[in-house]
Amino acid sequence: MIIMEEAKKLIIELFSELAKIHGLNKSVGAVYAILYLSDKPLTISDIMEELKISKGNVSMSLKKLEELGFVRKVWIKGERKNYYEAVDGFSSIKDIAKRKHDLIAKTYEDLKKLEEKCNEEEKEFIKQKIKGIERMKKISEKILEALNDLDN
């Protein structure tokens, strides 16, 4: 059982640090980790008890995780409380990567259209920015390809 507790602690630390890297509060990662580790849906109280953090912190973390598509509310017959469970992390990561790629691709296309309309003085500036966005677009395409390959 000691090994399981140590593994659980490592997973919570992993998701907390990943959240931090992405500009989120570490508690967002910890809440996801608890749900990821659980074999059944949990209530806010369950998560509070497990992580020893406030109700407000858990609620805000769950809201953010729901927005990102990493967590969903589940209904349990005969229960009045809200229950939450982790969504498959890989699908969520793919979805986020796709949304980022779509945003980059749209901006790239919009800049290309602007380039056609600008004068010579503006053209050099726009070209430089397009080159940078194009690199981002190529990288995001490769990331999506890799994620799709892993999923097959």
Curated annotation (Swiss-Prot):
Keyword check for Nucleotide-binding: no
InterPro entries assigned: ArsR-like_HTH, HTH-GbsR_regulator, HTH_ArsR_DNA-bd_dom, MJ1563, WH-like_DNA-bd_sf, WH_DNA-bd_sf
Domain HTH arsR-type: 7-106
Keywords per UniProt: DNA-binding, Transcription, Transcription regulation
DNA-binding region: 44-68
Transcription among keywords: yes
SUPFAM superfamilies per the UniProt record, alphabetical: Winged helix' DNA-binding domain (SSF46785)
Superkingdom: Archaea
GO molecular function, one term: DNA binding
Entry similarity comment: Belongs to the GbsR family.
Family matches, as PANTHER family: HTH-TYPE TRANSCRIPTIONAL REGULATOR MJ1563-RELATED
Protein name per its UniProtKB record: Putative HTH-type transcriptional regulator MJ1563
Organism: Methanocaldococcus jannaschii (strain ATCC 43067 / DSM 2661 / JAL-1 / JCM 10045 / NBRC 100440) (Methanococcus jannaschii)
